[in-house]
Regions:
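Active-site acidic carboxylates
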Residues: 1-99, 148, 152-155, 163-188
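Short, well-ordered alpha-helical scaffold segments within catalytic/effector domains
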Residues: 29, 113-117, 140
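Internal catalytic-core helix/loop-beta-alpha segment
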Residues: 75-133
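Surface-exposed beta-strand edges and their flanking turn/coil or helix-capping segments
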Residues: 59, 106-109, 143, 168-169
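Histidine-anchored nucleotide/phosphate-binding helix
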Residues: 35, 137-148
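Glycine-rich anion-binding loop/nest that anchors nucleotide
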Residues: 125-138, 155-160
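A generic secondary-structure signal
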Residues: 34-38, 118-122, 145
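Short active-site-adjacent structural elements
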Residues: 103, 137-141, 162-165
């Protein structure tokens, strides 16, 4: 069994002070960095929301389900990884959402166009741990797509931050129903 870590959207615009801030995002960035000092994965990847023209994904009157305030514009500080996240151990970054809404890291690709699932398979990965921001949106979508792609999947809940308790609970129920393991802490 070969396992990879997928760090989802730990970016400035999703942390405190950002355009679509999630409470606890900066702390999660630091906790992931601490975890990276002691974990042992065959590969470590990260995703980045990276919008050029996402069309209807952005709205001046967002519903926070299908539409959102503008965020993570390509080549802006908001799209950068949060400074609390140690990016040195990351083997590859997958960019998503350039021209449409993209919640899952599996909708992203490297700068040379390699899709996440393909990249993981070339590394012999069969299991993934997923963490990051937001538990109830992009972490959820990435974990569900990992299962759909055939990877054994676990969400590291203590290394993730979500938008609201109610939507986190709904997301966790959906993940469990899909066969995703929920690890309450990194020792799980």
């Amino acid at each position: 069994m070969s396992t990879a870590l997928i760090i989802v959207d730990v970016q400035n615009d999703f942390c405190e002070g950002g355009l679509v801030a999630v409470a606890g995002g900066a702390a999660v960035a630091e906790q992931i960095s601490e975890y990276l000092r002691v974990c042992d994965y065959a590969a470590i990847t990260a995703t980045r929301d990276y919008h050029i023209d996402p069309r209807a994904h952005f709205s001046d009157n967002p519903n926070f389900v299908d539409t959102w305030p503008p965020h993570c514009w390509a080549d802006t500080p908001g799209a950068d990884f949060h400074p609390n996240l140690d990016t040195a151990p990351i083997d590859e970054v997958f960019f998503k959402g350039a021209y449409s809404a993209a919640y899952s890291g599996f909708q992203g690709a490297t700068k040379d166009g390699t899709a996440l699932a393909d990249w993981l398979r070339t590394k012999g990965i069969d299991t993934v741990d997923v963490c990051g921001i937001a538990t109830d949106h992009c972490v959820r979508a990435t974990a569900l797509d990992a299962r759909t792609a055939g990877f054994d999947t676990r969400v590291l809940l203590s290394l993730s931050a979500g938008v609201s308790p109610a939507s986190i609970d709904r997301a966790l129920d959906e993940l469990r129903e899909a066969g995703v393991e929920i690890a309450g802490n990194i020792e799980s």
